[in-house]
A protein has these predicted regions:
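Internal active-site segments that recognize and position negatively charged phosphoryl groups
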Residues: 6-32
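Structural motif
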Residues: 11, 36, 109-110
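Short, ordered loop/turn segments at secondary-structure junctions
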Residues: 21, 45-48, 118-120, 151
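Short, small-residue-biased leader/transition segments that mark boundaries at the very start
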Residues: 1-2
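Alpha/beta catalytic cores of nucleotide-metabolism and tRNA/nucleoside-modifying enzymes
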Residues: 65-89, 98-189
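Glycine-rich beta-to-alpha transition loops that act as phosphate-gripper elements at the mouths
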Residues: 17-25, 90-101
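Structural preference for beta-strand elements that scaffold enzyme active sites
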Residues: 15-17, 40-42, 90-92, 113-115
Length: 189
């Protein structure tokens, strides 16, 4: 498994980031990728751009709503990463990140960086590159406000903010056997 990815990694002289395409990376996949020597990941969870749906549309294939929603949500993929990845792994969060609040939550869950695609592409297509640049600037300013309210100077410090977890995410944590209280107090790094 992951033979082609290993070949690519071994053939290039730059770091390789393993990126999911809208379905998230679960703990089991993180473990397999770690065994192959990968240390950088973009979880690209369900909730953002769904590449299987894009490919199906391109091929003229109809997807059921259930299949189109398939995947591990970004939040859950980040929680799996916390429990699986070593401290020195690079973890990027994308998939459904649309606001500064989404970005702050991703940083709080251990992401080293976040990726935002759909809102930017829509702005570029509908209003031009300047509108997209304004969006990024406003997002950065709003993220700074979240950090100020939480007493953080950097996005990485958001990992130290205690979490409150409810609903399906709390159920996910329990189903994985993760220790909720510990997870809410400490995240990667």
């Amino acid at each position: 498994m992951y033979k082609r990815q290993v070949q690519i990694r071994d053939a290039v002289s730059v770091p390789v980031i393993v990126k999911e395409t809208g379905c998230g990376i679960a703990a089991e996949q993180y473990e397999l990728l770690l065994e192959q020597g990968f240390t950088a990941f973009d979880c690209a969870g369900a909730g953002g751009t769904n590449f299987p749906a894009i490919e199906a549309k391109r091929q003229g294939v109809e997807l059921t709503e259930e299949f189109a929603a398939w995947g591990v949500p970004t939040c859950w993929s980040l929680l799996d990463a916390q429990q699986t990845l070593p401290q020195n792994a690079l973890l990027l969060a994308s998939g459904g990140i649309r606001s500064a609040g989404d970005a702050a939550r991703a940083f709080a869950l251990g992401a080293d960086a976040v990726g935002i695609t759909a809102p930017l592409l829509c702005l570029v297509m509908e209003q031009g590159i300047d509108a997209a640049a304004d969006y990024v600037e406003a997002l950065a300013e709003e993220l700074q406000k979240y950090m100020l309210l939480l007493g953080c100077l950097t996005p990485k410090e958001l990992r130290d903010v205690p979490l409150i977890v409810t609903g399906e995410t709390r159920d996910f944590i329990a189903s994985r056997g993760y220790e909720l209280a510990k997870l809410c107090r400490w995240r990667r790094g």
